[in-house]
């Protein structure tokens, strides 16, 4: 975590949420499948629901936000590159993004 010292607080929190989600994703998906399966007994389904509720709050997929990996900005982020508008423009003009060229017609 020491190498991530340049990140702003919200970007750092988002990174932690992404890691937590990755750790608990399989467990969450399997318990959701059990909980949503109407053919299983009600007791088994309710136990699966309790296991889902016992997972950390930050491990939920809705906690993951689309933030710039350089600046931590939450708006104007290109999903394919994970960069906000201005860092994207700077890297594109410096030819540091593969496959991106300035348009000319």
From Swiss-Prot:
Major subcellular site: mitochondrion
Q: SUPFAM superfamilies from the xrefs? A: Glucocorticoid receptor-like (DNA-binding domain)
User: Which cell locations does it reside in?
Assistant: Mitochondrion
Q: Can you name a GO cellular component term?
A: mitochondrion
- Any one Gene Ontology BP term: mitochondrial translation
**Which UniProt key words apply to this protein?**
Mitochondrion, Ribonucleoprotein, Ribosomal protein
The UniProt entry, under InterPro entries, shows: Ribosomal_uS14
Molecular functions (GO terms) = structural constituent of ribosome
Recorded coiled-coil stretches: none
Q: Name one Pfam family in it.
A: Ribosomal_S14
The organism's place on the tree of life at top rank: Eukaryota
**Family that this chain belongs to:** Belongs to the universal ribosomal protein uS14 family.
Q: How does it assemble?
A: Component of the mitochondrial small ribosomal subunit (mt-SSU). Mature yeast 74S mitochondrial ribosomes consist of a small (37S) and a large (54S) subunit. The 37S small subunit contains a 15S ribosomal RNA (15S mt-rRNA) and at least 32 different proteins. The 54S large subunit contains a 21S rRNA (21S mt-rRNA) and at least 45 different proteins.
Summarizing the function annotation, the protein's role is: Component of the mitochondrial ribosome (mitoribosome), a dedicated translation machinery responsible for the synthesis of mitochondrial genome-encoded proteins, including at least some of the essential transmembrane subunits of the mitochondrial respiratory chain. The mitoribosomes are attached to the mitochondrial inner membrane and translation products are cotranslationally integrated into the membrane.
Q: What is this protein called?
A: Small ribosomal subunit protein uS14m
What's the source species for this entry? Answer: Schizosaccharomyces pombe (strain 972 / ATCC 24843)
Q: Which gene encodes it?
A: mrp2
